Amino acid sequence: GRIPKLYKDGYRNPIYTTNATCDLCAIMLPDSGHIQETEAEWKNRKRIRRGELPIDPIYDAETAAKCLELFKGEPYDQIIELDDNIHVRFNDAGHMLGSSTIEIWIKENGENKKIVFSGDLGNNDIPLLSEPTMIEDADFLVMESTYGNRKHIRNDNKAELFIDIVTDTLKKGGIVVIPSFAVGRTQEILYELNRIKDSNLD
């Protein structure tokens, strides 16, 4: 989300991403820039009424669109040479479209080290997504761990519970409102609704 800010501050080097992330950013970053502009306008109306100086948006839609020229989409499971001493590989993290666990091989002072970096990891058996790629070794591991100390109870019938709630609400004449992230969860919800529709279940 802050890549356009880096561009605004002068960054002009390549930005390596997975192919899917590159495609998503082409849509999402200019939209994010528009949101930044709108929020700054809203805040500035209040600031001006209070006699305060206006603020600039963190970045705008034009900057967000320009930074996309630096993006280099890469496939999963392919080693990319950044220079003689640094190589990287994107592996499917199974969290959302384009998410990755990154292996980084660094050669420094004749010594090779491997760093693995990952944000969120997906679960197994999720429709629409591949299972996370297992990384077998690393000298250093850096990863997101919001739920690292929790044991999640597997709920194999969560789709059916979801459909039961939707069906029950509609039968009562209610309206179903499902707050969800635009990328990831929304597609899973639409998949489940379409699956039930295609199955002709009531």
Mark where each language-model region is.
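His/Asp/Glu-rich metal-coordinating catalytic cores
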Residues: 1, 6-188, 194-199
